[in-house]
Amino acid sequence: MAVKKRGLGRGLDALLSGPSVSALEEQAVKIDQKELQHLPVELVQRGKYQPRRDMDPEALEELAHSIRNHGVMQPIVVRPIGDNRYEIIAGERRWRATQQAGLDTIPAMVREVPDEAAIAMALIENIQREDLNPLEEAMALQRLQQEFELTQQQVADAVGKSRVTVANLLRLITLPDAIKTMLAHGDLEMGHARALLGLDENRQEEGARHVVARGLTVRQTEALVRQWLSDKPDPVEPSKPDPDIARLEQRLAERLGSAVQIRHGNKGKGQLVIRYNSLDELQGVLAHIR
C-alpha cells in the first residue's frame, strides 16, 4: 500500500507521539502472560519498513541456540495486517532465530499501528540502533526523508544526529555499487567512503580497491585522495608493520615454506596471503596445510 507523503515534516511529531518501539519492547517484557499471544511463526512476516536486509549468520545461530535452550525471553511486537497474518514492528532477529531453532510458535504482543506510524517508528528506531552498517543507516535516512518529505535538518532532529552527519551519510548512496558492497561487508569504514567521495566517479572504485588492498587507514585514504587530486608523485606513507604480525608472518612462512603476508584490518577482519612461484611450491604449501 502506498503511503501518502507529508509535506516537510508536518504531522511527523504527531505520528511519533505514541509509544516508541523501544517502549513497546519494554512493555512486552513486563506484560502479563495472559495478554501475550503465541503466534505460529508462518503467520508472521518481516516488517516491510525494516531497513536492515542482512543479518550476521553466526550471531543469528547463537541466538537460535539460546532460544532452543531457554525459549524466547523477550516477546516480539507485531501488528495485524489481515488474513490472520501479522507484520513485525520489533524483533525480526528473534523471529528469524526462532524459525532457525525449529520452533512452531513465538510469543508476541499485538498492537494496532497504522502504516505511517509503522514507517516512522521502524526507520527512526533502527537508525538509532548502533549495529547498522553505514550503508544501511544511509538508506534508512533516505527512506525517512522521502516518505515524509523532510529536510536534512528535520531528519537530523528526528533521529538525534547532527545535520552534517546526516548529510555525510546520505552522500554514501551516490557511491558506485562496488564500494557500497565493501561498506556493507565492513571492508571499508564510513571515513574511507567519505574521503573517496572527493574523487571523480570513475576513480572512486579504483581508489576503494587501492585502500582495501593496502589496508590504508582513514587518514592515509584522505592523503591518497589529496595526492590523486593534485597529481603529486609523493606516495602515501605506509603504516608501520605490527611487530607481532611480522613475527607471525615469519613463523607461518617457515612452517609453510612460502612467503606469507597478513593484512589485518581495523575491525579484526583481514586477509592471509600465501605467495608461491610455481605449482610445485603450491603443492608443498598444500601438503603442509593438510
From Swiss-Prot:
Q: Which GO terms describe its molecular function?
A: DNA binding
Pfam families per record:
HTH_ParB, ParB_dimer, ParBc
As recorded in UniProt, coiled-coil segments are: none
From what superkingdom does this record's organism come? Bacteria
Give the record's GO biological process terms.
chromosome segregation; positive regulation of sporulation resulting in formation of a cellular spore
- One GO location term (cellular component): chromosome
Q: What does this protein do?
A: Involved in chromosome partition. Localize to both poles of the predivisional cell following completion of DNA replication. Binds to the DNA origin of replication.
**Name the UniProt record assigns to this protein:** Probable chromosome-partitioning protein ParB
State the species of origin.
Pseudomonas putida (strain ATCC 47054 / DSM 6125 / CFBP 8728 / NCIMB 11950 / KT2440)
